[in-house]
Amino acid sequence: MISNDTRTAPGSATRAHNGVVPKAKDLEQRLQRTEQQLRLFQQISRMMVREMSLQEVLRGIVNLVVEFTACDSCLVYLVDNEELVLCASNTSHPSAIGRVRLRLSEGLTGWVAREKRLLAISREAYKDARFKFFGDLPEDTFEAFLSAPVIARNRVVGVINVRHKQPHQHTGGEMEVLTTVGEQVGCLLVVARMHPTAVESANHVQLVLSSGPAGAP
């Protein structure tokens, strides 16, 4: 005789419920993070089409990245011949903009530019053999390092760095976001070169620095 007893064993319903709830929460968190990413990209896109100087836009972008990643520092370097020049930062004194330089052969930032690849180091980035010390930048002692190339027309024109003072395990989402932001900055620079007031012979660094300091009218 075949039994049709479908009664659930004691505790099995609770176990099933306990398994479903974490999955639902995980899915909800992923959806929220995706919405935050889309919001970030939208904010950057809107900033790119406003009547703002390049320095203002870049400063706005680094501030948005800092807010999204909860990092302590975000820096944008742009290529000037064989050097990378600091053109935007959420922390550096204004005098550091355009002054801090490193060769493409130097540092973790130079490696990212040369290799055209993302680089993530969760702790003790300053111990990496490729690391370059500046001496006058607080980021010299920061633990975690995340960096992505700035791409314009399939060419590296800069690098964007995210730094954490404490060790930080970078998520796949953070890596994707920084990669996309690097591409958005590249698009911004391409569009800037099309502006009627842009000097044809000027490179990206000259375009940014000649646009006036952030906050200028």
Predicted regions and their residues:
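Allosteric cytosolic regulatory segments
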Residues: 179-186
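Acidic/proline- and glycine-rich, intrinsically disordered low-complexity segments
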Residues: 95-119
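Signal-transmission linkers at sensory-effector interfaces
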Residues: 2-50, 55, 157, 188-215
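Short beta-strand-to-loop transition segments that serve as allosteric relay/switch motifs
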Residues: 92-93, 159-168
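A short, aliphatic-rich beta-strand micro-motif
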Residues: 143-151
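GAF sensory/regulatory domain recognition
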Residues: 63, 73-100, 104, 124-127
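Signal-transducing coupling segments at domain and membrane junctions
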Residues: 94-95, 122-144, 164
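Amphipathic alpha-helical coiled-coil segments that mediate homodimerization
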Residues: 40-48, 53-72, 76, 108, ...
